[in-house]
Amino acid sequence: MNKNYSYPLDLSWSTEELASVLSFLNDVEKAYESKVSAQQLLGSYAVFKEVVPSKAEEKRIGREFESVSGYSLYRAVQAAKNTEKGMISLGK
């Protein structure tokens, strides 16, 4: 997939909020490109949900991110929830 894409970010977020969202999106990328700890991904998802508590907003960000990267936030989080412990890798 093209590595030159823009992240779906809200410019009204604080620097700390932007860092939290980017951390989660980076963990999703790791799940597809190599592997990531399920606990790490779930932890960054919990912090992401503090910044983006709305399900509708989460889905919008997920759709935008998947359209530019090919990586699904939903599938990554579900894989982490199903694994709970250990590493997840969604790459083909």
From Swiss-Prot:
InterPro entries: BH2638-like_sf (IPR023324), UPF0223 (IPR007920). Belongs to the UPF0223 family. This is UPF0223 protein SGO_1052. Signal peptide: none annotated.
